[in-house]
Amino acid sequence: MTNIRKTHPLMKIVNNTFIDLPTPSNISSWWNFGSLLGICLILQILTGLFLAMHYTSDTTTAFSSVTHICRDVNYGWIIRYMHANGASMFFICLFMHIGRGLYYGSYTFLETWNIGVLLLFTTMATAFMGYVLPWGQMSFWGATVITNLLSAIPYIGTSLVEWIWGGFSVDKATLTRFFAFHFILPFIIMALAMVHLLFLHETGSNNPTGIPSNTDKIPFHPYYTIKDILGATLLILALMLLVLFMPDLLGDPDNYTPANPLNTPPHIKPEWYFLFAYAILRSIPNKLGGVLALALSILILVLVPFLHTSKQRSMMFRPISQCMFWVLVADLLTLTWIGGQPVEHPYVIIGQLASIMYFLIILVIMPTASIIENNLLKWK
């Protein structure tokens, strides 16, 4: 008799995704981040659900309801901090996952890659709206500044911003709709993640060498389930260390002050995971130019597959490209640092140089390095 997991319509899907999935035998720990992102998403949905049971999306009570969750709800403080720091862990895993895709040439799976970019956009939108909900100073001013950027769009800009706000400023209507969107988007992310997996399983996983591994596949379970469990344990350990010992390390002290439209904080800045894009936005003096650069800093990922000029898929055997990849990582870390600094000398010029380098490396230097490597290997 055939095993039920191979015949039952529902079990068959689970079996083909997590148990009997043919997987390359040589994938490294960099391939752990997909499952870690799944764990992060489930964790965020669960903690978010419990927070939503006690939160009120009204400008007069939102801040107090978050305080109430932390002080009066049983284990409310741990749920709140797991949700806030869980978002940081989510983005750490996201950046590692994207970095892995860039390094090993996983972007040649076009559908999987493009849905991944869409997932990144959706996650960023969700995180931004979530940051507005506690209705602290940085929540209010962050929402005002970022939504106001849309007013740079010619002709329809101002109307669009007022339509998003639901009035002439960020107010009750804005908070209510942000809560509604913040609640629904994670489920859309979950659906997109399933489509992401569907397309991945059409082609099978890439591997560090970038060479097709159809001749050497092993079942996902038990080899990679045990590896994923180790990764998940380390992720939860890191998250709980953050939650229990340094819950406010990655937050902003200004968000412990209730929102006040009459008092602007000295330095308006988003959460750390948006700082690189914020630095690119600020590096251009023109408003529309800044908005375009901000959008392009993420949209550029869609162009990466078309900029691949190497005869090899992975960077494993391409030292010049490897070097440029790590320069890009250093550049992104520089942008993240600059995004958190005030707009004054020397930060402005450093931010502008780092922004130019970011686009230059992706659009010009890396494709050129690949062509040089092809020629060095006599691959015309």
From Swiss-Prot:
Biological process, per Gene Ontology: mitochondrial electron transport, ubiquinol to cytochrome c
Subcellular location per the Swiss-Prot or TrEMBL entry: Mitochondrion inner membrane
Gene3D superfamilies cross-referenced by the UniProt entry: Cytochrome Bc1 Complex, Chain C
Disulfide topology: none
Required cofactor(s): heme b
UniProt-listed SUPFAM superfamilies: a domain/subunit of cytochrome bc1 complex (Ubiquinol-cytochrome c reductase), Transmembrane di-heme cytochromes
Matches recorded under InterPro entries: Cyt_b/b6_C, Cyt_b/b6_C_sf, Cyt_b/b6_N, Cytb/b6-like_sf, Cytochrome_b, Cytochrome_b_C_euk/bac, Cytochrome_b_N_euk/bac, Di-haem_cyt_TM
UniProt name for this protein: Cytochrome b
Organism: Capra sibirica (Siberian ibex)
